[in-house]
């Protein structure tokens, strides 16, 4: 993908927009505060953006406060870990609960991990969504996708390089969408990106 922004937008276009429950509008669950692309992607896909709050005291979301009806009609849920603007990461146990929730209610869990390599305590790196899947024995990463970018980790926002990884069935649908929507990368940019991803 040409950066996390494109990936975060495109996954909703590729994977959401149906009536999950006949006669009811589907939704995308979005953290608040949020990256504006989450909301815009949901609106343009024709699904309702529904916000879940980040507790200002803990800088952590309270997923138990999400309306169960919204979970039933949810097609996709965004998480951002480490979060922006708080910098807080979701703990492993919380990620596991979210994966179980995604499988129970059959929605796609999309983790925006563009800040995953930025943390204060170098002895405690952030746990990613796919790592949590593996801890649970979910080696197919069912219902889960992660988005990464060079923008933050390598201070290269103008290079527009990112990737999506996770559930192979979801990636296949994403790639089909991107075949017709995404733009090609210049060869000299590709060479620079390869070097940057290796650092």
Question: What do the predicted segments below correspond to?
Answer:
Residues 76, 108, 145:
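Short, Asp-centered acidic motifs that coordinate Mg2+ and/or phosphate
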Residues 113-115:
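Conserved Walker B
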Residues 26, 47, 104-108, 141-142:
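A short helix->loop->beta-strand "cap" motif at the edges of active sites that frequently abuts
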